[in-house]
Curated annotation (Swiss-Prot):
This is Protein MGF 110-11L. Plays a role in virus cell tropism, and may be required for efficient virus replication in macrophages. Signal peptide: none annotated. Keywords: Glycoprotein, Host membrane, Membrane, Transmembrane, Transmembrane helix. Pfam families: v110. Glycans are attached at N97, N294. It comes from African swine fever virus (isolate Tick/South Africa/Pretoriuskop Pr4/1996) (ASFV). It comes from the Viruses. The lineage of its organism: Viruses, Varidnaviria, Bamfordvirae, Nucleocytoviricota, Pokkesviricetes. Belongs to the asfivirus MGF 110 family. It is a multi-pass membrane protein.
Amino acid sequence: MYFYKKYLHFFFVVSKFKFFLKMQVPFGCNMKGLGVLLGLFSLILAQQLPDLPRTQHPPKRELKYWCTYVPQCDFCWDCQNGICKNKIMETQLIDSNHSIVNCRVSRNSETQTCFYEISSKMPNHFSMSCSHPTPYIGNEIFMKKVGGDYMTLLTLKQYCLYFIISIAFAGCFVYAVRKNLRLNTTIKLLTLLSILVYLAQPVLNRPLSIFYTKQFLPRTYTPPTRELDYWCTYAKHCDFCWECRKGICKNKVLDDMPPFIIQNDYINKCSIARYFDRCMYFIEPKIPYIHYMNCSLPTYYG
């Protein structure tokens, strides 16, 4: 329901935008209207996703699914009889086989921190910073885990691109003022530039969606063998995970897959991407056969 409201709000703004284009008003008022439109667009982009809910005491039959939710904070607990073992990272301040009574994990979207309770007697909470998995860009040389210099390089690339975009927008505005262009022509120029900026998002490894600007969900390609667990952790954002061995991809999360693909079907590319609320993976030899699956956040345990 949350995302449906955002879509309805977006289409309402678009309809008002089309109506505004047909109006012929003085140039001074046009600039005010343009400012209002840009403000509405910024408001849409600034909308926050809802906080990720707390998970607590998953039943044994749901352990895989609960563990699927936890990797959004880059760690995953395999909980059996009160013993939680970290399946992703070994170099933590807490022992991998430490007894965690409650196995409780929560995420605060404002502070970007995760908490899990070590003992029910003292409540001792350990805070861990959350970060999104480093994207794979298709070349094994550039594949690094979180903590390397890749994110810094990506941030610099973003700043450079945004600086160029700012200059382009300012240039369009100055050109429109000097030439005394009508509002219709001015907005067409800015709209064209906005479309170009929107299509340039894959350069920054970001999804083509204004509703997921707060998430870093880049495209993943075939990972090296040593990175399979980490790549599989990222793929679980779409509620399925492929264990790829020599081109054979086995689904580790869901057994009741649609009839379009068999659990042990041969998938040559083993690539997963997320656009809007869908994931896709490529199947051989039916090129370019693409099967779409709806994405959703795992159900939490209250």
